[in-house]
């Protein structure tokens, strides 16, 4: 977020230079699968999410000072699962599995390589001294080893968890916490 470029120090507005914004994602699921409940064929390449993400990626690669880093989607491991709230109700015997409908399942697919790309970029920026501050906008803690490395090398490491609560032990691995939106 560009709002991280300005901050108040001693009640004065300070602007930082932007080295680059790195955007990490993976291509959307493009395969066709059949819903296990209804048997209906679903072409995920035509879903609203797939269309949105392809369009977003095209816009991002044309944006100045922005690097799009794409991991891989593990399409072979894509499988149908019960939505978490449905699985919980089945396990608690609140609903019978025979009453499950086609909208009670969702596709489960994993992205590969995104965490590694984040860590490599943080390490590269750190060792090449391309920035003195890194702001990571993330909702998970997979970045901890890279953040530790950056901090040991003198980088001011800020986490923007997008207003999500973070575990207390995560504070020891960052220099600051700041959500902007």
Question: Model-flagged regions — what are they?
Answer:
Residues 70-181:
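Nuclease catalytic cores that cleave nucleic-acid phosphodiester bonds
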Residues 1-89, 102-107, 155-156, 161:
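Domain-level signal for Mg2+-assisted phosphodiester chemistry and nucleotide/NA-binding surfaces
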């Amino acid at each position: 977020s560009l709002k991280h470029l300005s901050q108040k120090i001693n009640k004065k507005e300070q602007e930082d230079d932007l080295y680059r914004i790195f955007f990490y994602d993976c291509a959307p699921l493009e395969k066709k699968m059949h819903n296990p409940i209804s048997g209906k064929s679903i072409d995920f390449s035509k879903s609203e999410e797939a269309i949105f993400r392809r369009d977003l990626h095209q816009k991002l690669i044309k944006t100045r000072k922005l690097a799009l880093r794409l991991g891989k989607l593990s399409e072979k491991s894509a499988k149908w699962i019960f939505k978490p709230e449905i699985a919980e109700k089945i396990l608690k015997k609140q609903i019978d599995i025979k009453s499950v409908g086609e909208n009670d399942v969702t596709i489960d697919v994993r992205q590969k390589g995104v965490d590694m790309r984040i860590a490599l970029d943080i390490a590269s920026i750190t060792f090449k001294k391309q920035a003195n501050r890194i702001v990571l906008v993330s909702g998970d803690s997979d970045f901890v080893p890279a953040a530790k490395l950056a901090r040991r090398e003198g980088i001011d490491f800020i986490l923007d968890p997008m207003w999500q609560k973070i575990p207390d032990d995560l504070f020891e691995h960052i220099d600051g916490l700041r959500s902007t939106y």
